Amino acid sequence: MVVEADKKALICSFCSKKQHEVKKLIAGPAVFICDECIDLCTDIMKEENKVALKQITSSIPTPQKICGILNDYVVGQDQAKKILAVAVYNHYKRLEYVQSGNNDVELNKSNILLIGPTGSGKTLLAQTLAKILDVPFTMADATSLTEAGYVGEDVENILLRLLIASEFNIAKAQKGIIYIDEVDKIARKSENPSITRDVSGEGVQQALLKIMEGTVASVPPQGGRKHPQQDFVQLDTSNILFICGGAFMGIDSIITSRTNHSSIGFAANVNIDKEKNNSEILKSLEIEDLTKFGLIPEFIGRLPIVTTLDELDKEALITILTKPKNAIVKQYQKQFELDDAELVIDYSALETIAEKALAKKTGARGLRSILEHLLLDSMYKVAELKKQRVTITKEVVNGLVEPIMTSLISTKSNKKQPIITDIPA
């Protein structure tokens, strides 16, 4: 057997330096990289991180400006808006401080927990914040998550969605916002430790702890379970802001039980208001109530900022229908305009729509489905007829009559009518 004496010299695949010209030469599948190129790549990544952070932090509005923009889209919830505005502002100022290299005071991350009834604006608040700050944003449903190794979705898939939202720009993804909805559904099934594994409750809380606190997570770019041989993307979650939301149905009973128990005997308040609504009860929320509900103390500790949202009343729902920039009625009016038609809604009809949404206990979320049902036939017809004015009255909402359609051509005045009529003074 003849051994080749003059073997080909190993060189860096990037800078072409030979092995003896560098300190280290690291081998990969058919490629090599030297220590100098690794240092250069590290410097480039650090510089890109600084640029990405500077773009975000240089454009951070003040808390008052954030609140002002939120007011354009979200009706009511003033206290929640204020808390969120301050929390988000401080979060991104913290990133700027950390990136500057200062370490005289260690600033910890403050994730947020939103508690409020269905349709009160939790998701919309998170979405609007991401839009204001122009950062990558993704939403996840906690009910689909399970502990690793069980049927369901791994928590790392949440990070994958954020990467996709940032177009796999790791530096941008590491400064993004993740909203986890229905977090109350991963509450522990029982206060007492169970001998059976709670893979969709406490198990998910445990799995979320690390990524919420801050860790370098291995994210599978093609999803975790179908492609086990893929290369992982390393994502640092230390600067990702986590916002969790949930309705926490039944926590009002826990709060009431605690407050009533603490007011027995001579210290009892005889003027206890038995007519308190859920919003007022939630204002008395304590950490122990969340623990009693089923969140483990470690998980609650990762969510230091807790705010509650009010239940929307009829007036708030009417405002949601008509006032915000993305108001539902405005959206439908624009749809009709695209077909050379007009949509006019009586104020009494809006009141009835709001009452129906309240009866269904779906909050603002139910408004669109009610309007969609009311306007379906009209939208079907105006696309063909054109130049039509569609009027929705209280009787139409109650199903007593069909929407009133009149031709704009035949009317004496072609002048555009206001979107809402008979508004009370």
From Swiss-Prot:
UniProt keyword terms in alphabetical order: ATP-binding, Chaperone, Metal-binding, Nucleotide-binding, Zinc
Disulfide bonds: none
GO CC annotations on file: HslUV protease complex
InterPro entries attached to this UniProt entry: AAA+_ATPase (IPR003593), ATP-dep_Clp_protease_ClpX (IPR050052), ATPase_AAA_core (IPR003959), Clp_ATPase_C (IPR019489), Clp_protease_ATP-bd_su_ClpX (IPR004487), ClpX_bact (IPR046425), P-loop_NTPase (IPR027417), Znf_CppX_C4 (IPR010603)
GO molecular function: ATP binding; ATP hydrolysis activity; ATP-dependent protein folding chaperone; protein dimerization activity; unfolded protein binding; zinc ion binding
Pfam families linked to this entry: AAA_2 (PF07724), ClpB_D2-small (PF10431), zf-C4_ClpX (PF06689)
Residue ranges of domain ClpX-type ZB in the record: 1-53
GO terms of biological process kind: cell division; proteolysis involved in protein catabolic process
Residues engaged in binding ATP: P117, T118, G119, S120, G121, K122, T123, L124
Record-listed Zn(2+) binding positions: C12, C15, C34, C37
Function according to Swiss-Prot or TrEMBL: ATP-dependent specificity component of the Clp protease. It directs the protease to specific substrates. Can perform chaperone functions in the absence of ClpP.
Subunit structure: Component of the ClpX-ClpP complex. Forms a hexameric ring that, in the presence of ATP, binds to fourteen ClpP subunits assembled into a disk-like structure with a central cavity, resembling the structure of eukaryotic proteasomes.
Family: Belongs to the ClpX chaperone family.
Protein's name in the database: ATP-dependent Clp protease ATP-binding subunit ClpX
UniProt organism field: Rickettsia conorii (strain ATCC VR-613 / Malish 7)
